[in-house]
């Protein structure tokens, strides 16, 4: 149900987020249909109950219409509207916990409405109970969807049918949820220490350079003894030798991701792209794109291991 938006941009409602996602479109359509069936049936049942009010019990076996059912109808309407707004605004990752809580409360109300109407012999009340049953089935599916993590297999399978599911859906959650910590240090994020040969370090007691220094320390002028003169080594530094990084894991992108423009360590990738991963510990994985061999870090909740 996620859709794209510019990095750090304001969330805007777009019907394309619903129309482009078969799961969102189907469940919202069914819920609206179930709600209209329930609402119209409750109106008819309420009119019939008011008409039969004051009659003996034998002429009015169903009694008064339960007011509780109206509260369930109104709550269900706000529940559906809330889901539509959250999905259309591409704010699922921001409000999925709140939506799950509201859905759980709605499940209690809807099933209670079924219990108060399903045993009646009145056709309108039975139709209202049928609408509540259909609505409760949609609510159960929504609770499972919104309560699951994006990397879970069922949710990733449902999201894979979306026509346009791009980068911004979980970018802010990934940045805020991680709080800028727990990110692996990569060759792009930290400059490795300089590597020196023994000849370059001749005469130094502590050969360790300052981490991150871009130039080797200048050798001091050494004293002269007789004909033997200690000359500073003006030889250029040997080329930096870094151990090769293995990428033993393969991961598939379940969402597209757009790298933060202010962070050169992140890489962008598209949905369903296969990445080579060097380490799967932590919340950010060092990955390499195939074809371009671009290396950087990627949020683990956008990827699923193969």
From Swiss-Prot:
It is a multi-pass membrane protein. Residues 204-242 are annotated as: Disordered. Pfam families: SH3_1 (PF00018). GO terms for cellular component: plasma membrane. CDD domains: SH3_Sho1p (cd11855). Keywords: Cell membrane, Membrane, SH3 domain, Stress response, Transmembrane, Transmembrane helix. Forms homooligomers. Plasma membrane osmosensor that activates the high osmolarity glycerol (HOG) MAPK signaling pathway in response to high osmolarity. Affects fungal virulence. This is High osmolarity signaling protein MOS1. The gene is MOS1.
């Amino acid at each position: 149900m996620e859709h794209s938006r510019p990095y750090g941009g304001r969330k805007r409602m777009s019907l394309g987020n619903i129309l482009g996602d078969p799961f969102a479109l189907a469940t919202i359509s069914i819920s609206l249909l179930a709600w209209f069936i329930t609402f119209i049936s409750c109106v008819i049942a309420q009119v019939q109950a008011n008409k039969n009010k004051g009659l003996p019990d034998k002429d009015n076996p169903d009694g008064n219409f339960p007011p509780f059912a109206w509260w369930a109808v109104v709550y269900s309407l706000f529940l559906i509207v809330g889901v539509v707004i959250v999905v259309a605004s591409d704010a699922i990752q921001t409000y999925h916990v709140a939506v799950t809580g509201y859905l759980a409360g709605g499940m209690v109300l809807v099933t209670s409405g079924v219990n108060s109407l399903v045993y009646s012999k009145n056709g309108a009340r039975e139709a209202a109970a049928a609408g509540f049953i259909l609505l409760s089935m949609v609510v159960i599916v929504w609770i499972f969807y919104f309560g699951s993590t994006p990397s879970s297999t069922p949710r990733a399978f449902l999201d894979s049918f979306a026509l346009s599911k791009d980068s911004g859906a979980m970018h802010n959650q990934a940045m805020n949820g991680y709080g800028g910590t727990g990110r692996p240090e990569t060759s792009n994020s930290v400059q490795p220490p300089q590597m020196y040969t023994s000849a370059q370090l001749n005469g130094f007691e502590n050969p360790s350079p300052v981490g991150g220094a871009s130039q080797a320390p200048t050798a001091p002028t050494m004293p002269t003894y007789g004909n033997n003169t200690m000359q500073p080594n003006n030889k250029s530094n040997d080329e930096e030798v870094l151990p090769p990084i293995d990428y033993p894991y393969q991961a598939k992108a379940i969402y597209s991701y757009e790298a933060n423009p202010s962070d050169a360590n992140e890489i962008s990738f598209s949905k369903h792209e296969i990445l080579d991963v060097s380490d799967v510990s932590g919340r950010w994985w060092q990955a390499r794109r195939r074809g371009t061999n671009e290396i950087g870090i990627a949020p683990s909740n956008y990827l699923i291991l193969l």
